Regions:
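Long, low-complexity segments enriched in small/aliphatic residues
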Residues: 1-57
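Long, contiguous, secondary-structure-rich segments that constitute the structural scaffold
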Residues: 49, 54-68, 72-155
Length: 155
């Protein structure tokens, strides 16, 4: 769907308008302390999902799964660059290294895809296990991979 500029809470599709069923689907989770948005995606090149994460060059550059966190949020959590953190959603959790960077929004945490639990060098639980398979876009049926509510704590 396409976001409509005049009705920001609706997605427009030729011939129909889809309105979210619940205007505040995350209110309950926010009340439970899930105050950050988990964004997942591809890490920077040359690491490309399972094709390259076994290469020694990628292992040198990114030996561990990381979570990018804004410096202001990191300070409020008493985190320093390189600390081990737990990123938790209502569906699971992972452990990663904190990468403190001003290149991310204050209320977000970025965790890359492509690290799996069967890696020979640094086994981690995949971030995909943390997604809510029931929370789907009403038009495309795509699962929510970009704004899943989470909380971050020091491991």
């Amino acid at each position: 769907g396409i976001m409509t500029p005049f009705h920001p809470n609706t997605l427009g599709v030729p011939g129909r308008i889809v309105t979210p069923k619940d205007e505040t689907p995350g209110a309950k989770l926010r009340a439970e302390g899930y105050d950050m948005e988990l964004v997942t995606g591809r890490p920077p090149a040359p690491h490309f999902h399972s094709w390259t994460h076994y290469f020694w060059q990628s292992q040198e550059m990114w030996p561990d799964l990381y979570a990018q966190i804004h410096p202001d949020k990191a300070a409020s959590l008493s985190l320093e660059d390189g600390d081990r953190v737990i990123v938790k959603t209502s569906h699971g959790s992972i452990e990663a290294r904190a990468w403190i960077t001003p290149g991310i929004r204050k209320g977000a945490v970025f965790v890359p895809i492509g690290w799996g639990e069967k890696q020979p060098y640094h086994p981690w639980r995949s971030v995909n296990f943390m997604t809510d398979k029931t929370q789907r876009d009403p038009i495309s049926e795509q699962t929510n991979l970009k704004t899943l509510l989470c909380r971050v704590t020091k491991a």
